[in-house]
Structure formats: structure tokens, C-alpha cells
């Protein structure tokens, strides 16, 4: 994927419990061989095309990865755990985009909120959620699903709002604000997201869906204002930064 960078994994490469395999989740033979070779008992499915704007200009990749790729993983898990000798858990990482959009006066999404995807990305994730549920109901595959809000944190690809704004501020480029910037999003730090997923894997109930949020609901314009204040303070505290970012206002 264009958003992946193997250098982000450098700190893990010498760990005995870590193995890096470059492949495609749509490669059924590869996935089946990995499940069998390593006798995997927990599959956590993070892999996805996830940028809404890209899904609008090019939805095919989202259908291929998010729907067909998920189905490939499910087929491999079924073969190894249901039809074969293994036994395990398939955890599916999804998004709150499947529920649609929130207005200022709306309550937070619940696990029972009806699906109302508004973009090809959201629709592809909604479809994958339903496939995961179907494999549980039809074949008895042990599954859990989590629907998270907007993630942020280290190494995030700079097409997402927070890293893109930070780069644009430092480079003196216009900030990516759509309309009046009043769109409300909940922001979830990536480590908090991972802790929640670990809790679901350890204590979750098979077949259930769990919403994961950061309790940080902000309008996009407010997020941008916070970032501007942080950068401004950094330049105040460390004046020499200006020579590295001469175009920053």
C-alpha cells in the first residue's frame, strides 16, 4: 500500500515474537500458509484502504481490499479453524464511518446504531462488517468487531487531517479545511485504540461489536486551531526551528 512504510517497523525487527511478511491479504494461498505454518490462533484484521477522499476518486481499490480482502482472510480462517485442526479468533477492525455523520445535537453512535455509510470507503467497511458477522452466524467462526473513531498518532500517513495540517503549517501551505470546518469528529490516539482492541480480544464476547472512541469530539476547525497554537508555541520556545522551516508563518 502507498501508505505503508517498513521503516516504521524497525524497532520490532529483532524481536523473537515478530515476523514481517510482505504480501497481499487478497493472496489466499499466502494467508492459508501463514495460518498453518505459525499455528496462528488470533488474527487481528487492521488492513484497509481508509482515506475517504481517495474512495470517492477511486473506489475500486476500496472494494478490492476492504471487501474482497476481508473475505479472503475469512475464508482462510474458516479453513484453518473450522474445517481444519486449529481454533482461533478473528478480530475485525472497522470504523464509525459505517454509521454515517453526526450533527452537533446528535448523541454518540452506539453499537445498535443503524448503518448509514456515506462514502465508498464507509460502504466498503460496512460490507466487510457484514461478512464477518455472516461467517460467525453461518459457519460458527469466532469473531469480534470494533468500530473506532478517527485515529491519530506517530507515523500516520500525511493525507489524514492532523499530520497534513502539521506539514502544511511548517511548509507555509494552505490548510485543508472543507467548508466552514464545523464537521465534528471524535479523535482517538492510536495506542488507546490498540489497548481497547487488546481488551476486546482478551474479554470480548464472540459475535459482538464494540465501539471505540476517544471522548474527544471536536470540530475540524477547532483541531486546526489547536495545531496552530502548538506549532506557534514550539517556534516561540525553540527559535532555531525557523531556519529549518523558513516558510512557516
How would you name each of these model-derived features?
Residues 4, 23-26, 163, 167-249:
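C-terminal substrate-binding subdomain of Rossmann-fold SDR/epimerase-dehydratase oxidoreductases
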Residues 54, 112, 158, 241-244:
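Residue-level detector of alpha-helical hydrophobic segments embedded in or interacting with membranes
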Residues 5, 154-158, 216:
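Residue-level signature of the cytosolic catalytic core of signaling kinases
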Residues 1-151, 171, 191, 220, ...:
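N-terminal Rossmann-like NAD(P)+-binding domain of SDR-like oxidoreductases, especially those catalyzing
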Residues 105, 158-166:
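A glycine/serine/threonine-rich, flexible loop-to-helix segment
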Amino acid at each position: 500500500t502507498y501508505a505503508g512504510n517498513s521503516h516504521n517497523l524497525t524497532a520490532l525487527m529483532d524481536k523473537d515474537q515478530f515476523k514481517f511478511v510482505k504480501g497481499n491479504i487478497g493472496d489466499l494461498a499466502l494467508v492459508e500458509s501463514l495460518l498453518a505454518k505459525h499455528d496462528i490462533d488470533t488474527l487481528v484484521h487492521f488492513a484497509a484502504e481508509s482515506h475517504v477522499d481517495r474512495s470517492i476518486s477511486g473506489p475500486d481499490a476500496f472494494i478490492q481490499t476492504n471487501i474482497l480482502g476481508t473475505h479472503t482472510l475469512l475464508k482462510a480462517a474458516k479453513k484453518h479453524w473450522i474445517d481444519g485442526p486449529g481454533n482461533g479468533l478473528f478480530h475485525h477492525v472497522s470504523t464509525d464511518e459505517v454509521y454515517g455523520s453526526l450533527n452537533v445535537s446528535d448523541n454518540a453512535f452506539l453499537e445498535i446504531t443503524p448503518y448509514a455509510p456515506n462514502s465508498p470507503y464507509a460502504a466498503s467497511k460496512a460490507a466487510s462488517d457484514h461478512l464477518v458477522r455472516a461467517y460467525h452466524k453461518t459457519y460458527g467462526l469466532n469473531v469480534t468487531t470494533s468500530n473506532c473513531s478517527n485515529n491519530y498518532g506517530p507515523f500516520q500517513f500525511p493525507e489524514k487531517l492532523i499530520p497534513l495540517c502539521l506539514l502544511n503549517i511548517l511548509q507555509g501551505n494552505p490548510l485543508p479545511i472543507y467548508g466552514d470546518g464545523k464537521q465534528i469528529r471524535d479523535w482517538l490516539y492510536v495506542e488507546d485504540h490498540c489497548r481497547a482492541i487488546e481488551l476486546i480480544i482478551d474479554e470480548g464476547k464472540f459475535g459482538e461489536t464494540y465501539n471505540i472512541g476517544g471522548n474527544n469530539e471536536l470540530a475540524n476547525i477547532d483541531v486546526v486551531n489547536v495545531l496552530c497554537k502548538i506549532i506557534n508555541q514550539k517556534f516561540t520556545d525553540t527559535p532555531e526551528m525557523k531556519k529549518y522551516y523558513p516558510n512557516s508563518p
